[in-house]
């Protein structure tokens, strides 16, 4: 089950990373690190600080939408809100908001 969830997350990540700003090498390394950290997060939800730590260790400019994406995943894991139809609609709206923010190219450096 975890393998499929992480694969889906990896596919979703393809649509939010800023291709125009990062080199392919930097993009690939950060994507792998982030997907691995999310996989560990699914196994051990109490380690919610792991995703920001990966961002910190890579010393990269991070799009605001990526942090919101990770935050949304943490909330889903912690409160298990992916089960009901209403919550699925909320998550869909939230991801649309994330993609909109990403189009604005709002970035900051951790």
UniProtKB/Swiss-Prot annotation:
Topology of the protein relative to the lipid bilayer: Multi-pass membrane protein
Transmembrane residue ranges: 32-52, 57-77, 90-110
Keyword field contains Transmembrane: yes
BP terms from Gene Ontology: chromosome segregation
Tree of life domain: Eukaryota
GO CC aspect terms: membrane
Presence of keyword Protein transport: no
Location relative to the cell: Membrane
Alphabetized UniProt keyword annotations: Chromosome partition, Membrane, Transmembrane, Transmembrane helix
Described function: May play a role in proper chromosome segregation. Suppresses the high-frequency loss of mini-chromosomes when overexpressed, and this suppression is completely dependent on silencing protein SIR4.
Name this polypeptide is given: Uncharacterized protein YCR041W
Species of provenance: Saccharomyces cerevisiae (strain ATCC 204508 / S288c)
């Amino acid at each position: 089950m975890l393998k499929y969830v992480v694969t889906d997350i990896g596919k979703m990540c393809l649509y939010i990373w800023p291709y125009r700003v990062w080199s392919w090498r930097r993009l690939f390394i950060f994507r792998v690190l982030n997907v691995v950290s999310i996989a560990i997060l699914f196994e051990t939800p109490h380690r919610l600080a792991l995703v920001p730590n990966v961002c910190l260790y890579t010393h990269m400019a991070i799009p605001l939408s990526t942090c919101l994406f990770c935050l949304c995943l943490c909330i889903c894991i912690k409160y298990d809100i992916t089960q009901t139809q209403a919550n699925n609609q909320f998550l869909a709206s939230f991801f649309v908001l994330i993609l909109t923010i990403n189009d604005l190219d709002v970035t900051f450096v951790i």
